[in-house]
């Protein structure tokens, strides 16, 4: 199944100025943020289904879908970047993470395809070769990572078009929830949280990476968005491989991605696994999608396996920032300590 447009029922109204060329009032025009440095690009999201207990089969299924995505769907437009979902090589269960975990020997100062291909990681080897074969950026969803200190992380490796492992994001915020009558899930029983923000430097501009539950924390996206924002070098998008469940998905999936997009005036990209139709394992929400800086979901799948194509358009970012110039209207003199925790007085 290939998709290019959002579902009709999810098309959202958009402010009239967004589609027209405005002559902004002098006071607003003088405050306009500098144009974002970047160029438009095409992205493909693989909403992967059929993940089971056989890791080799899971990897082969992902590889086949990457090869399919490269063909560009019905339009035949090859994507510049391909994204896989969260935990695509393993069942999504705390009891499985250590069993399926792999070492990821990543040194950003020595990024190379050989570093990935020669590692003992079956998943890294496949992803590196797939990126090289596709000649496209590849955000490798996420996989369980076994660190040298024996800790387990939920980690997202990113590969450049020549197959080099260029970034590794470890999920910062762990998914520990207990919703009465809904779902109880505690990643912290197995996983350790990461401790850094991950930003890619690409020919399209800066792109930040988060994983699933990271989306619920506006501070992470805000921190990523502020990097170079004042001189037009801020992030153009933030990508989240994610696996919301069928309790939180219908409540918050669309809401949170639209909020992060509007807050930071960049694109939000969400790539989910397809929803499992049998068994008693984890049921992902699905609905992989792309939201623009005005909060419009411009492309979205439903719950089944599929490949979604969308364009990340620099003109859309610049028009949003010119029309509602919050990037230059923030009052850091009032809330300079917005991310600090204060003790009760």
Language-model-detected regions and their locations in the chain:
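N-terminal mitochondrial targeting presequence
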Residues: 1-31
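N-terminal active-site segment of His-dependent metallophosphoesterases
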Residues: 30-81, 239
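Short, glycine-anchored, charge-dense loop/turn motifs used at functional sites
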Residues: 43, 158-166, 289-299
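Cys-nucleophile CN-hydrolase/nitrilase-fold catalytic domain and related Cys-dependent amidase chemistry
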Residues: 55, 67-162, 166-168, 176-177, ...
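Active-site catalytic loop in hydrolytic enzyme cores
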Residues: 105-109, 145-236, 245-259, 323-326
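CN hydrolase (nitrilase-like) catalytic-core segments centered on the catalytic cysteine
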Residues: 116-139, 206, 212-308
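Short beta-strand scaffold segments in enzyme catalytic cores
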Residues: 140-141, 155-158, 198-200, 288-290, ...
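A conserved C-terminal secondary-structure "cap"
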Residues: 317-345
């Amino acid at each position: 199944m290939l998709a290019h447009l959002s579902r009709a029922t999810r098309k959202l109204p958009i402010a009239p100025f967004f589609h027209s060329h405005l002559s902004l009032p002098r006071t607003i025009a003088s405050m306009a943020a500098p144009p974002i440095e970047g160029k438009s690009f095409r992205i493909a999201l693989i909403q992967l289904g059929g993940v089971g207990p056989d890791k080799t089969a899971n990897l082969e299924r992902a590889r086949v879908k990457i090869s399919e995505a490269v063909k560009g769907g019905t339009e035949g437009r090859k994507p510049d970047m391909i994204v896989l979902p969260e935990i695509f090589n393993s069942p999504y269960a705390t009891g499985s993470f250590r069993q399926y975990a792999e070492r990821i020997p990543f040194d950003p100062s020595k990024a190379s395809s050989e570093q990935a291909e020669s590692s003992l990681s079956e998943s890294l080897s496949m992803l590196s070769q797939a990126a090289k074969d596709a000649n496209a950026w590849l955000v490798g969803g996420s996989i369980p990572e076994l660190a040298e200190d024996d800790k387990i992380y939920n980690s997202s490796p990113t590969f450049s078009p020549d197959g080099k492992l260029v970034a590794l994001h470890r999920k910062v915020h762990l998914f520990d929830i207990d919703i009465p009558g809904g779902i109880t899930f505690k990643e912290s029983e197995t996983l350790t949280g990461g401790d850094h923000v991950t930003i890619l430097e690409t020919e399209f501009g800066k792109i930040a990476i988060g994983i699933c539950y990271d989306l619920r924390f506006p501070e992470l996206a805000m921190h990523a968005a502020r990097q170079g924002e004042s001189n037009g070098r801020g992030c153009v998008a933030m990508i989240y491989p994610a696996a919301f469940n069928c309790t939180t998905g219908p409540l918050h999936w669309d809401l949170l991605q639209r909020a992060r997009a509007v807050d930071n005036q960049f694109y939000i990209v969400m790539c989910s696994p397809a929803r499992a139709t049998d068994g008693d394992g984890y049921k992902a929400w699905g609905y992989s999608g792309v939201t623009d800086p005005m909060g419009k979901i411009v492309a979205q799948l439903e719950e089944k396996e599929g490949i979604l194509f969308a364009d990340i358009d620099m003109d859309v970012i610049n028009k949003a920032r010119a029309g509602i110039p919050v990037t230059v209207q923030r009052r850091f003199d009032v809330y300079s300590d917005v991310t600090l925790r204060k003790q009760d007085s």
